[in-house]
Amino acid sequence: MQCPHCHHNGSRVVDSRPTDDGRVIRRRRECENCGFRFTTFERVEATPLLVIKKNGAREEFNREKVLRGIIRSAEKRPVSMETMTGVVDDVENKVRSLGENEISSQVIGEYVMEQLADIDEISYIRFASVYRQFKDMHVFLNELQDMMERDKVKLAKPSAKTTHAPKRKKD
């Protein structure tokens, strides 16, 4: 490691410890030439993930951009910031687990919508209306009907969490 003071290429590590989140190693170093002490940080370099946009342009995956879209769709809804960041974490983990260097923005949008559908229906519809660019009211209504059908299927399946006995009719 080159000394920032005298530019000598030799240094020794005096102290090494992980940071609070454990993702970065902080190292105190001392120059072998002039004795100047300095700090370096070592972290795993994430492979850049490129998003292929609808127009074919490519840009680096941006967590903040995904989060902004979710925040906009959940505006004035009972969805916590923690939940929204959790969605972004889940989407990013899912995308990175595919092992690809490039992914289409459509796939990312679908992953976000899968998550939002289970969290808040209004946020889901808002996100879908921007993401899918509904051309007219009929396309919008079709999306609502699909959502209502999914709800019916969910309601028809008995929940494993149900522990109480069904209510009996009074005679």
Curated annotation (Swiss-Prot):
Kindly name one Pfam family recorded for this protein: Zn_ribbon_NrdR
Q: Does the keyword Transcription regulation apply?
A: yes
Q: Where is the region Disordered? A: 1-21, 152-171
Q: Which cofactor does it need?
A: Zn(2+)
Q: Which UniProt keywords apply?
A: ATP-binding, DNA-binding, Metal-binding, Nucleotide-binding, Repressor, Transcription, Transcription regulation, Zinc, Zinc-finger
PROSITE patterns xref list: ATP_CONE (PS51161)
Q: Which InterPro entries match?
A: ATP-cone_dom, NrdR-like_N, RNR_NrdR-like
A GO biological process held by the record: negative regulation of DNA-templated transcription
Q: How is the cofactor bound?
A: Binds 1 zinc ion.
User: What ranges does the record list as Basic residues composition bias?
Assistant: 1-10
So which domain of life are we looking at? Answer: Bacteria
Zn finger residue spans: unnamed: 3-34
| GO MF annotation: an example | ATP binding
Q: Where is the ATP-cone domain?
A: 49-139
Give the protein's function: Negatively regulates transcription of bacterial ribonucleotide reductase nrd genes and operons by binding to NrdR-boxes.
NCBIfam families associated with the record: transcriptional regulator NrdR (TIGR00244)
Q: What protein family is recorded?
A: Belongs to the NrdR family.
Listed name of the protein: Transcriptional repressor NrdR
Source organism per UniProt? Lactiplantibacillus plantarum (strain ATCC BAA-793 / NCIMB 8826 / WCFS1)
Its organism's taxonomic lineage begins at:
Bacteria, Bacillati, Bacillota, Bacilli, Lactobacillales
